[in-house]
Design a protein with these regions (language model features):
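Conserved lysine of the Walker
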Residues: 33
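Interdomain motor-coupling "hinge/lid" segment immediately C-terminal to the ATP-binding subdomain
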Residues: 119-121, 126-226, 259-262
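Hydrophobic positions on the alpha1 helix immediately C-terminal to the Walker A/P-loop
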Residues: 36, 40
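Accessory nucleic acid-recognition modules appended to NTPase machines
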Residues: 181-339
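Pre-Walker A adenine-sensing motif
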Residues: 4-18
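Domain-level recognition of nuclease-like catalytic cores that cleave nucleotide substrates
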Residues: 377-398
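Hydrophobic anchor at the beta1->P-loop junction of P-loop NTPases
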Residues: 25
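Short glycine-rich substrate-engagement loop in P-loop NTPases that contacts/grips substrate
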Residues: 54-84
C-alpha cells in the first residue's frame, strides 16, 4: 500500500527529540499512529549515529512473552546500550496490562527517550495524567487532511474532482487500498463499529451497546446542531431507545474520549464568556458519516462545516461556536493572539444566502479577521472586509 510522509506530525516529533518527556501518540483507530512512529524511527536511523533503538510492537507475536509489565521492564533494560542515545518505542502499549508501571519506572531512570502509541479507547487523553507520573507530551494524529489526500492521489485530476471524492471517502487512508466504493465503506464502517461496539464497551464495561450505537448514529446525523444530553435522551427515548440524560452525558464523553467526536463549546462574543448550555459535536472524519448514513440527509452545508471544524483543530486552533445576540457564528477560533470569525456554507451564489452568512459577521465590532468558507469554485475575494474562500482551496492551504 502506498504511503506518504505526514510532514506536519513528523516535524512535531522531531522537535521533541531528546526532550525529557514521554511522547504519546494518540488518535482515532487507524489514523496512522503506528506509521508515524515507523517514519520517525527511519528518520533517526538516517540522520543520527551512535543511537540504540528498542522497538516493541505488541501486535507482533514475537513480543508475546513480554506482555506483562515486569517482563516488559526487564526486556528494555536488557537491551539498553551504555554510551549511546537509547530510544524506546512501544506500539499498542495497552496490550501489556499495567504497562504504565513499567513505563514510569523506565522514565524515572532518565536513560531513555520514550515514545508510545496505543488504541484510542485505552490510551485516552483524559487518562494520561493518571497513568504517567512523569511529564508527557501528547501528539494527536487526525485522519488524512484534504491536502494529504491530494498528496496520496498525486495524479492528473484537478482539485475539484479530488474534493468531491474526499467529501465521501474521508481521511481513513486504510480504505484507499480498496477499488470499489462498497469495500471502502465497509472498511470505514468496520473501524467505526470496532470502536463503538467493542473498544468502548470493553473499556467502560458497558452492559449493552444499543444506546451507545443509537447515540453515535444520532450525533452523526446531527453534526453542527446545538445539542444537550437532556435533549438527546428525550429524542432517543421517543424513538424507542429508552435512556436518560445522565447515561447520554456519560456516553457522549466516552465517544469524545475515543476521538470519534469532538465537542465544541459556545462563546458569547459580546459578553466575552464561555457558555455551559448546549454544545456542538463534530465527527472526526467525513468518510465515517457517509459510510454510516450513505447519501441519506447528505446536507453539504453540515458536511462542509464538519470538515472545516476538524481542519481548524488539525491546525492547532482552539475552536468555539460564537453567539452574538440571537445570531450564531459558526466558529470563533483562537491560537495565541490570533483570532478569526468564520462562517461556513454550501452554496452562497444566491444574494439571500450570501447576505444571511454575512450578517452576523458584519455585526461584530472588533478588528479581528472575518471569513466565509463555502463551495464557491472561485479564487478568494473580499466583501465589506470579509474574506470569501472556496472550501477546497482553503483546505489546501497550510
Amino acid at each position: 500500500m502506498k504511503t506518504i510522509t505526514r510532514a506536519k506530525y513528523l516535524d512535531r516529533i522531531i522537535e521533541l527529540n531528546g526532550t525529557p518527556d514521554i511522547k504519546i501518540i494518540t488518535g482515532i483507530r487507524r489514523s496512522g499512529k503506528s506509521k508515524l512512529m515507523q517514519a520517525y524511527i527511519e528518520y533517526l536511523k538516517e540522520n543520527f549515529e551512535n543511537i540504540n533503538i528498542i522497538f516493541i510492537d505488541f501486535m507482533d507475536l514475537s513480543f508475546e512473552e513480554i506482555k506483562e509489565y515486569h517482563a516488559l521492564h526487564a526486556y528494555v533494560e536488557a537491551h539498553y546500550q551504555e554510551g549511546k542515545t537509547n530510544y524506546l518505542f512501544v506500539d499498542e502499549v495497552q496490550m501489556c496490562p499495567k504497562f504504565e508501571l513499567a513505563i514510569n519506572s523506565l522514565y524515572s531512570k532518565g536513560k531513555y527517550d520514550i515514545y508510545i502509541t496505543g488504541s484510542n479507547a485505552f490510551l485516552l487523553s483524559a487518562d494520561l495524567a493518571t497513568l504517567f507520573t512523569g511529564r508527557y507530551i501528547e501528539i494527536h494524529v487526525f485522519p488524512f487532511s484534504f491536502q494529504e489526500y491530494c498528496q496520496y492521489y498525486d495524479d492528473s485530476r484537478d482539485t475539484d474532482q479530488l474534493f468531491e471524492e474526499y467529501t465521501v471517502r474521508g481521511g481513513l487512508s486504510g480504505s484507499y487500498a480498496y477499488r470499489t466504493e462498497k469495500d471502502r465503506t465497509n472498511y470505514i464502517r468496520e473501524v467505526y463499529e470496532t470502536i463503538v461496539t467493542r473498544d468502548l464497551v470493553q473499556k467502560y464495561s458497558l452492559p449493552d451497546t444499543l444506546v451507545l450505537q443509537r447515540l453515535s448514529e444520532f450525533l452523526t446525523d446531527n453534526i453542527s446542531n446545538l445539542t444537550s444530553p437532556n435533549k438527546v435522551s428525550q429524542l432517543l427515548t421517543a424513538s424507542q431507545t429508552v435512556t436518560n440524560h445522565v447515561t447520554v452525558g456519560k456516553y457522549i464523553k466516552y465517544l469524545c474520549n475515543a476521538f470519534v467526536f469532538y465537542d465544541i463549546k459556545r462563546f458569547d462574543i459580546r459578553g466575552k464568556k464561555y457558555l455551559e448550555s448546549s454544545e456542538k459535536f463534530y465527527l472526526c472524519d467525513a468518510g465515517i458519516r457517509y459510510a454510516i448514513l450513505g447519501s441519506r440527509n447528505m446536507d453539504y452545508g453540515r458536511v462542509y462545516e464538519n470538515m472545516v471544524c476538524i481542519e481548524l483543530l488539525r491546525r492547532g486552533y482552539d475552536v468555539y461556536v460564537g453567539k452574538l445576540y440571537q445570531k450564531e457564528i459558526d466558529f470563533v477560533v483562537q491560537k495565541g493572539s490570533e483570532k478569526v470569525y468564520i462562517q461556513v456554507s454550501d452554496n452562497i451564489s444566491s444574494p439571500e444566502t450570501f447576505q444571511r452568512e454575512c450578517a452576523p459577521l458584519l455585526q461584530i465590532r472588533d478588528a479581528y479577521p472575518k471569513m466565509i468558507i463555502a463551495r464557491t469554485r472561485h479564487p478568494k475575494y473580499s466583501y465589506e472586509g470579509i474574506e470569501i474562500h472556496d472550501i477546497a482551496e482553503w483546505l489546501m492551504q497550510e
